[in-house]
Structures are given as structure tokens and as C-alpha cells.
Amino acid sequence: MPHPDDFSLDAYDYQLPPERIAQQPVSPRDRSRLMVVTRDTAADHYFYELPQLLAPGDLLVLNDTRVIPARLIGQKVGAAGRTVEVFLLEELSDRQWLALVKPGRKLRPGAVIQIGPLQATVQTIDEETRGRVIEFDLPPGDRLWSYLDHLGEVPLPPYIDHPLADTEQYQTVYARRPGAVAAPTAGLHFTPELFSKLADRGIDHCFLTLHVGIGTFRPVEAKDIRHHHLHEEWLEVSAATVERIQAAKAAGGRIIAVGTTVIRALETAAHSGTLQPFCGKSDLYIYPGYQPKIVEGFITNFHLPRSSLMMLVSAFIGRERLLQLYQQAIDRQYRFYSFGDAMLILPSACHNTL
């Protein structure tokens, strides 16, 4: 049962020395460190040891979304060339997108932005996201997607101080379905060679898609976390993936979610109590008191203080245990956030394991 403190936003705070924020990914990717968490222990390993840390028959479920070049730089028309940043969030139609804009105060409905050869007009203000609905003036039959690789940049988290030499470093090696505005970072540690070693040990994998959206960037503001709401994100769990998961469970294997996005996608698809194919939007918000329906263990990075991701992990292992593990990680010089190290939360560590 959750403790009343588990619903307090302040109870998810911790102090992280700035030098523990990873500014660059390690190379090779699977040389990152891995804290392996069981019911009673937290052991130090490396990610390339994952095949030996799981059991034959276990099934890894991964998110194959790809980060789009969502950051556009333009000029406000008629404002002496004022620079404008447009951060695309979601395609609403062939011509319209939901976006965050800077400077927001100067971009009211009717404002026109020149982005390369394209003009875009602010239509409305979206109250939920504080963003703008923007309509792009495109040639007939065109969609903005065909312009993004030329006009856009892959957005990096705000705590990353320097651009990457190669933006593929912020994509998983299996990213194939464009649509995310942030990477599913638990998957950044995998390499083709690691997948081969996992297969040799009898550990298979399958994919789903969840396009990571604005919720990644929005801090929790409600003092009582139960009053927080996540922005909807599009996801798909295919019939083939459902069959793979059901077969693995029937054979005695464990379902290991790679990242919090996979947890939310699977739990959405199992909302009826039985995992079923799902294609649509979800705003599932997991925090202490939630009873998982399908996920048994998972891999996740170390998350920002007071974030909904900390609350999700706490729903599985408890808030106090999570904060203890984070302090141990700081003491042991682990690297935090998107390019940082990871945790493998084994089923025995989850107090509400299925």
C-alpha cells in the first residue's frame, strides 16, 4: 500500500551533483554501467553483461520509435527578422502541427513565421500544452515530413550542453518509425552485437511503438502527484507482438520492458486485464498504487528529480527504495539522465510482481 508521502511531489526530489549528468554517450553503447536490482541487492555490472543477467526464455520488449528533426529555426515575418524557434510535437493534419514556440509571447494567432522556403501561420493557442497550432503553407500533396531532414534538427534534452558529432547517437540502433521528439533512452545501450549474444543465450526480443511526446519535457507541477496529467502519446502494440509476449509467458519466460515508454504501452494494451493489440493514443499515468498487468521487470535509466518517470519506477519498487538506489548510484559514480547508465529492475525487486 502506498504511504501518504508517496503522493507528495517533494518526496521525489534528490540532489544530483552536476558532474553526474552524462553529456556524451559512451562508446561502444553497451559499455555503459548497469545497476542490477533484486529484492535485497543492487550490484554493479556493465550493459554488455545483460545476456548473463537474464534467463533463457526471457523476452525483451523494445520501442522502435525514431526521433524526428523536430526543432526548426525561422524568422517572424514583419518583425525585423526576429528569430523564432519552433519545436514540433505532433502532426494534426497534412498541414497542421502542434508545436512549442519561442518567444511564445510574440507569437499570437495570426503571426507568420518564415522557415526556409516555407511559411507557417499560428492558428490557435493550445491550452493543455501551452503550445501553438501552426499551419504550414505547403504545395498541394506535400507533407511537412519531406522537408524536416533539410530544415530541422534533432532536439536534445536541455541539460545537454554541447551538440553531438553525430545525431544518430541520440537514436537507438533499431529506431525505424519516425514520430518521437525524444529518444526512448533505455534502448540507447543496445548494439547489434549485443542482440546477437542475447539470441545465442535464448533471449529473444520484439518491438512496439510509442512516439515519445511532450510529457518528457513537462515537469510535474501538482503538489499532490495524483492531480498530474500526462499529454497523450500515440502508440501501437501489434498482434504479432502480443503473440510473441503470450508465447513467452506460456513457456515460462519473463517479460522485460526496455524503458518506461514500453511499460506504459504494454500496460495500456493490457488495460482490460488481458494484453490485446492496440493502436491509438494513451495518457496512462503510472504512480504508486498502480497494479501492473503485464510487465514483470524492466530496464530504465536514472531520471530527473520530481519527474513522472520516477513516480512510474516507484510504482514497481517503492519510492524509498528508488531514492536509496539513486543515492547508491551517485556514491558509486554512475552517470545520470539520457546518455547515462541504466538499471535492470528484476522481477524479484518489484513488490507487486505478477
Curated annotation (Swiss-Prot):
Keywords from the named record: Cytoplasm, Queuosine biosynthesis, S-adenosyl-L-methionine, Transferase
Assigned GO CC terms: cytoplasm
EC annotation from Swiss-Prot or TrEMBL: 2.4.99.17
GO molecular function: S-adenosylmethionine:tRNA ribosyltransferase-isomerase activity
Pfam families, A to Z: Queuosine_synth
Family designation: Belongs to the QueA family.
UniProt name for this protein: S-adenosylmethionine:tRNA ribosyltransferase-isomerase
Organism expressing this protein natively: Thermosynechococcus vestitus (strain NIES-2133 / IAM M-273 / BP-1)
Organism placement in taxonomy: Bacteria, Bacillati, Cyanobacteriota, Cyanophyceae, Acaryochloridales
Recorded name of the encoding gene: queA
